[in-house]
From Swiss-Prot:
Necessary for normal cell division and for the maintenance of normal septation. GO terms for molecular function: GTP binding; metal ion binding. It comes from Actinobacillus succinogenes (strain ATCC 55618 / DSM 22257 / CCUG 43843 / 130Z). This is Probable GTP-binding protein EngB. Its cofactor is Mg(2+). Mg(2+) binds at S42, T64. Keywords: Cell cycle, Cell division, GTP-binding, Magnesium, Metal-binding, Nucleotide-binding, Septation.
């Protein structure tokens, strides 16, 4: 099979769901984007798709409370999961989000991979590690994307990547670590190549 290369610039908004029960049919391949409320998820999705307003960004962390689905091509979807861990969100709502996230990662059959976004200056917080555990226990491949990479010098970036790669060894899953800066598009090509690989089974010839 020749390598597929999807055009993420054609991605369009599909639908929003308040919980897993409201999601569309469990078919095709979905790739989920998860992260703390200030990790830059919406900004990363906008950089990937080269669309300024595809995923709505906000100065108020925790605004994305719904599961938002975007279609790259038929049967190829990106899923923007609710941001987790923001202090100003009521405890009850936080617990509800965490329950939904765990349920989605464990039960969604068409989930082909998970991108966990973390601010490169504050990686691997407790809730990030919880998400990694859930994904690994569900046998899902993971990409840990260290965002806002332009905030660090190149040597500090390399050092952080090395530290994160060593720290995740005990999880023993299929986990890769990359950096991303939406500001100067650093790492967007590597992100799209990883997504292409995860979507590839959709295009396998019979």
């Amino acid at each position: 099979m020749s390598e597929i290369k999807l055009n993420y610039h054609k991605t369009r908004f599909l639908t929003s769901a308040a919980n897993i029960k409201q999601l569309p049919e469990d078919s095709g391949i979905e790739i989920a984007f998860a992260g703390r409320s200030n990790a830059g998820k919406s900004t990363a999705l906008n950089a990937l798709t080269n669309q300024k307003n595809l995923a709505r960004t906000s100065k108020t962390p925790g605004r994305t409370q719904l599961i938002n689905l975007f279609e790259v091509e038929p049967n190829c979807k990106l899923v923007d999961l609710p941001g987790y861990g923001y202090a100003a969100v009521p405890e009850q709502m936080k617990l509800q989000w965490q329950k939904s996230l765990g349920e989605y990662l464990q039960k969604r059959e068409c989930l082909g991979g998970v991108v966990i976004l973390m601010d490169i200056r504050h990686p691997l917080k407790a809730l990030d590690q919880q998400m990694i555990e859930w994904a690994v226990s569900a046998d899902l491949p993971l990409l840990l994307l260290l965002t806002k990479a332009d905030k660090l010098s190149q040597s500090a970036r390399s050092k952080t990547v090395k530290m994160v790669r060593e720290a995740i060894l005990p999880f023993q899953g299929d986990i890769q670590v990359e950096t991303l800066s939406a500001q100067n598009k650093l790492g967007v090509d590597r992100l799209s190549a990883k997504l292409d690989a995860w979507f590839a089974p959709n295009f396998a010839t019979e």
